[in-house]
Curated annotation (Swiss-Prot):
Primary gene name: tauZ
GO cellular component, one term: plasma membrane
Name the record gives this protein: UPF0324 membrane protein TauZ
Main location (coarse class): membrane
Family of this protein: Belongs to the UPF0324 family.
Residue spans crossing the bilayer: 12-31, 36-55, 75-92, 96-118, 125-147, 162-184, 191-213, 223-245, 258-280, 315-337
């Protein structure tokens, strides 16, 4: 198993040009984000889309772009586990945990039901529903890694990442005002923001725009949603496998549990046991963020902008409906919990 995780020298040489281009795009996106405030994920995706010609067959960069979009992506998701610990659950309380967990499950079920109304398949429903329910772009990339591939897989992933990133940015501005309108306390505002906004960075921005208590609570709630990524991906993988829909190469069945999910769970367990020093956990979080940023740049490079626009209005309506559903559910839940 370990040997399969370590790229051969030939693979490294073939992949380096494409990886280097993806890393350069990611660094550029981060620079622009730091200086102009736009989300780095969104910028990396848009810059990548403009460089689609680098992924065309026969180019030196194509193999590395494909490698980065797949393998580096999985590494980034696995490293997210180092930020998760069981202590987070105890700090929040059972009522809020139940509300967050129910929001994740019901949003995914809503996506599966609503997708039929707009003529979208179950793959697209799991991709968009999971990304809205859990952690935006990171969840979209993790879920895409276990879904059976088809000719529109890359297009659907780019659409989902683009949509949840834009919606997260809008929510970062709008949702704190809604929290004030609903009369939420600082703690409830944090639960609302952390339980509804898609991406971690926008959750932090929205929470601390209200105050320190709201910001800390929002971040904690968001990380608990992130901790549900591995169980949800595992459930998706098991369901797909049970129905005989999983991808297979050379007639060999795919692994029951993807390696990156195992990595996520192992790191989360080690962190829960206090075996991961705070400095290492912080470093793993930074490495994860950069790996995901580089991977989404590669996904953008791989995707044709023309094909992405073929996704249709039904897909846009679906992801908007999922976002509204989650926000309404958490709002009602907070009022019920009092």
């Amino acid at each position: 198993m370990i040997s399969t995780m370590i790229p051969s020298r030939g693979l490294i040489e073939a992949a380096f040009p494409g990886f280097a281009v993806s890393a350069l795009v990611a660094a550029t996106a981060q620079f622009l984000s730091d200086h102009y405030g736009a989300p780095a994920m969104l910028l990396a995706l848009l810059l990548g889309l403009a460089l689609n010609f680098l992924a065309e067959d026969g180019t030196r960069t194509a193999p590395g772009v494909a490698f980065t979009a797949r393998t580096v992506l999985r590494l980034g998701v696995a490293l997210l586990g180092a930020r998760i610990s069981a202590g987070m659950l105890a700090a929040l309380g059972p009522g809020a945990i139940a509300l967050v967990a129910a929001g994740v499950v019901l949003t995914i079920l809503f996506a599966l039901a609503a997708s039929r109304l707009v003529g979208r398949g179950w793959r697209f429903a799991l991709l968009t529903g999971g990304s809205v329910a859990i952690c935006g772009a990171s969840a979209a990339m993790a879920i895409a890694a276990v879904l059976p591939r088809h000719e529109k897989s890359e297009r659907d992933l780019v659409f989902t990442v683009l949509s949840v990133t834009v919606l997260s940015t809008v929510a970062m501005v709008l949702y704190p005002m809604l929290a004030g309108f609903f009369g939420f306390t600082a703690r409830d505002s944090g639960v609302f923001l952390g339980g509804t906004i898609h991406d971690v960075a926008q959750v932090v921005g929205a929470g601390f725009s209200i105050g320190p208590e709201a910001g800390e609570t929002a971040t904690l709630v968001k990380l608990i949603r992130v901790s549900m990524l591995a169980p949800v991906v595992l459930c998706f993988s098991l369901a797909i496998r049970a129905r005989g829909l999983a991808d297979s190469r050379g007639g060999k069945a795919p692994p029951l549990l993807p390696g990156f999910v195992i990595g996520f769970l192992v790191l989360a367990a080690l962190n829960s046991l206090g075996l991961v020093p705070a400095a290492v956990s912080e470093l793993a979080g930074q490495l994860s963020r950069w790996a995901l940023l580089i991977a989404i740049a590669a996904v953008g490079i791989k995707t044709s902008l023309k094909k992405m626009f073929e996704v249709g209005t039904g897909a846009i309506a679906l992801i908007l409906a999922e976002t509204v559903f989650l926000a309404v559910f958490v709002t009602i839940g907070l009022h019920v919990l009092g």
